[in-house]
Amino acid sequence: MKLSPSFEDFERGWAQGRNQLVHARLAADLDTPVSLMLKLAEARSDTFILESVTGGEVRGRYSVVGMKPDLIWRCHGTGSEINREARFDAQAFKPLDGHPLDTLRALIAESRIDMPADLPPIAAGLFGYLGYDMIRLVETLPDVNPDPIGLPDAVLMRPSVVAVLDGVKGEVTVVAPAWAASGLSARAAYAQAAERVMDALRDLDRAPPALRDLGEIAPVGEAKSNFSHDGYKAAVEKAKDYIRAGDIFQVVPSQRWAQRFELPPFALYRSLRRTNPSPFMFFFNFGGYQVIGASPEILVRLRDGEVTIRPIAGTRKRGATPEEDRALEADLLADKKELAEHLMLLDLGRNDVGRVAKLGTVRPTEKFIIERYSHVMHIVSNVVGEIAEGEDALSALLAGLPAGTVSGAPKVRAMEIIDELEPEKRGVYGGGVGYFAANGEMDFCIALRTAVLKDETLYIQAGGGVVYDSDPEAEYQETVNKSRALRRAAEDAGLFARRGNG
C-alpha cells in the first residue's frame, strides 16, 4: 500500500512549518457510502457522512465519511469554546476569548492545507453546521424566543481521518492531516498520520455489521406541532398584514413538529437516502444529538475563487407519467405568483453575492430553469461572482446566511417578523450544513428537509414563502407537504433498524 507523500517530501514541508495530508488509495468498487460509514465509524459519536444525488437519480462523484476529530468548535450566543482533546475527552471544552466569528476565522486559518492536486477539497477541513441564529452575531435582531431543543448555535469538527469514496473510479482514498503546530517531529507526525490511514484501510477489509433483509416497519410517535392549525394560519395573516403595510415583500414562517423516535439514528438516514435522494445528503452524529438531512439547495459555495448562490423557489409535485410531468412543469412556469416569488429571491441572491464579489462580476448563469427531484420539481436560478480581495469563505457564507428562501425579503425585516410570528428559536433549521475545506474553499447547503434527533425525539421543521395574495390554508398545507419526506423516512426507518446502524 503506497502512502503519499513520501516521508522525504513530507519532511521538507514539515521543516517549512506546513500542515500536510497523508493519504492512500484502495480499490473499493464493492463499497457504498453506507458500508464505508459502518466499517470505519459505525455511525458513532463525532462521525459524519456527506453524499449527493442530483436530479433525484444521478449520484454525485464523491461521498465522504469523517471521524475521530482532533478538535471540535462550537458557539452558544455570543460565546464560543473549543475541545482540543476531542479524541479522548468529549467534555474537555474550554472557552475562547473574542467574538465567535473571530475565533472561527482563526480556526479556519489554522486548519489551512495546500491540498494535493489529486484530492478533492472535501478531503480535509471543518465539517458541521451554522444554525439560523448565527445571523444574530452579524445583524441586530431580537433574541427572546424560547429554545426547547437547546443545541449549540453552531458546531464544527475537524476529523483526523476522512475517507473519500470516488464513485467514478471505484476507489476510496483515506486521508489523515498532520498539523505543524502539534510540536511533533517530522518522523513522529508522519508515523501518526500513516498509522491512522492504515488503521482505516484495515477496517475497510471487514464486513459491515448488517443484515440484507429489510426488517419491519416500526411505529413512530404522533407528530405534534408548535403551532395549532388555526395558529399557523393566523401567523400567515399577520405576515400578510406586514406585506400590505409595506414592511416586506415576502416572509417565510415555519412550524416544527416533534415526535417519539426510538430507532437508531443512522436507520433514519438510511431510510431518508432511499425515499428522498437529494443533492445534499448528510448525517452528523454529535453524540447527544444527530442532524440528518436531504437538502435540495446550496446556501453558499466558494470554489475556484467563485461565489455561488442557487435560489430555489416555486414547486410542483412530480407527475405520475412523463406527460403529466411536462404539464405540471408548464403550469409552474405559467404561475405568476410563483414567478414573482422566485424573481424576488433571485434579486436577493444577486445582492448577497454582490456583498462579497468584485464589482461587475455578479451574473446569473441560469434563470428560471426547472430541476426535478424524487418527489417534486422546482424553479431554480444560479448566481455567481468572483470573490473580492479581503473577503474569504466565512464572509461569503455570512453574506448568504440565512438564505432568502427561509427568511424573506428584505431579509433583516423579514427575520424580525419571523421572531415575532414563530414561538420558538429555529436552531439548525434554516441555517447551513457543510464544510470549510482546508484549501480555503467552502460548500454549505441550506438546512431544509433536515431533522434533529435528541433524547429519542425527532424534530422536523418546514416553512413556506408568504406573499401579498397567499392563502393561509394553502400555506399551512405547503409546510405539511414539505415535511412529508422526513415523516416517510421516519416511518420506514424500521426497515433498516435490525442491524447495521452502529
What is each model feature region?
Residues 1-502:
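Extended alpha-helical targeting/anchoring segments
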